[in-house]
């Protein structure tokens, strides 16, 4: 945040958007998380829940919150698009080797075959409009 703060002029805005799937509200999301943890036990991005959003600690003293919006919504996926969404998370593509990713993909595809081709996954969306102090 200090670098972003440095780039912006006083009063300029910085928008943070977070889109977390909710594993405790979706069997598919929960099973996908368990599979990520099987291949990457150190992954810290699991277990997200609905929560009251607040300005990140790293932004305190640098930005004021002009507006914070948070809401839950169901997002439609196909097996392929959900697999892509999960693969893009830092627990898989940013952390595993190519060989591990291939194994994970095969197992995830097999797991998703147990469900309809199209489904919805609940997500918690947070949008923070921060203003440089």
Residue spans of the language-model regions?
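Conserved catalytic/acceptor-binding region of the Class I
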Residues: 5, 9-75
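Conserved Class I S-adenosyl-L-methionine
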Residues: 50-133
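A short SAM/SAH-binding and catalytic strip from SAM-dependent methyltransferases
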Residues: 1
């Amino acid at each position: 945040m200090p670098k972003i703060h440095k780039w912006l002029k006083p009063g300029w805005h910085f928008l943070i958007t977070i889109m977390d799937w909710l594993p405790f509200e979706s069997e598919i999301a929960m099973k996908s998380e368990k599979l990520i943890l099987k291949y990457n036990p150190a992954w810290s991005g699991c277990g997200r829940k609905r929560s009251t959003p607040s300005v990140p600690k790293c932004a305190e003293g640098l930005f004021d919150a002009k507006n914070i919006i948070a809401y839950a919504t169901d997002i439609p996926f196909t097996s392929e698009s959900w697999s892509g969404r999960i693969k893009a998370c830092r627990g898989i593509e940013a952390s595993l080797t190519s060989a591990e990713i291939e194994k994970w993909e095969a197992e995830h595809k097999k797991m998703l075959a147990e469900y309809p081709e199209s489904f919805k996954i609940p997500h918690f969306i947070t949008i923070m409009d921060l203003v440089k102090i």
